[in-house]
């Protein structure tokens, strides 16, 4: 199995519809909401959350300015965002654990951006 492809079962909590996703974002002067990413091996990783509460807890654990907030995305909006950022974002990390972004366990859920888009479209 390709690394990062078998995560679907753990991605959505039981009973969650999966129609809404949450990303930490900052509104730019242009009105565009720039997503928060982190770097791993020279590639940008976008954390994506299945609940607003998990995203808020994650945001609270980061040392970011108060301009950052949790932004809800429909599946279509998230797919569009990922298409806009192809050169910048190479990976998606679903529901990253607090304070353990770069641990081997967390990184085992890294999913290629294109694979994540395919998953979203297929849902």
Q: What are the functions of these language-model segments?
A:
Residues 1-123:
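Conserved NAD+-utilizing ADP-ribose enzyme module
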